[in-house]
Amino acid sequence: MEPTYLLARGILKPWLATWFRWTLEGVERIPRTGGTILAFNHIAFLDPFAAAYLVDEVGRRVRFLAKSELFQDKRIAWIVRGAGQIEVRRGTREAPMALDHAYRALQEGELVAVFPEGTITDDPDLKPMAAKSGAARLALKTGAPLIPCALWGTQNIWPKAFRKHWWPPRQDIAIQVGEAMKVPVGDESRDAITDVSRRLSEELALLVAGLRPAIADRRRPRQVRAA
């Protein structure tokens, strides 16, 4: 592992483990070795930290597909780059390079984590948005297990519109790991990509719905200004 990854892990893991109350279900479904794709729903800024915590619990390191803005933020760019994360330059000609890097990582037996929605969901009830094609493309090309994982509780900590606090409150976080999806490995046709992406969205929605009763959504209701 890169020294920067080990440094970040050494700082963040104890904090995450002691500050939040975790419920992890289905962890045994994550392979301990070999190329693996974990696909998470995205409801808050804390989600990558929660995903990394889950992966570390099974003794693996994680490579995230991360938006380029994180690599340009001087406060964290040195960590993101030094920890070997994969930059996604969305909307540019270089965007496909991210999948090439992820493909090589999977071929080398690494675990790659993705947020297939591409950004934090805009749904007011935090339902997953439609998955973009990246996760499906990787699974179809490499044959690596594509495993949907649902996050819940992080929306009470660092939600999309948080303004009042930078230090996160103590809260419960739950993660449900689903079953690896069956995909037609080697079929990289548009129909196959569309079908796998659709099924991934459906699986994430079902997993999230199963977690919702466990942790109340404590976000403040959005204020509607009078006309």
Q: Where does each model-flagged region fall?
A:
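Short phosphate-coordinating micro-motif centered on Lys-Gly-acidic
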Residues: 26
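Residue-level signal for beta-strand positions within conserved beta-sheet cores that form or flank
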Residues: 20, 60, 171-173
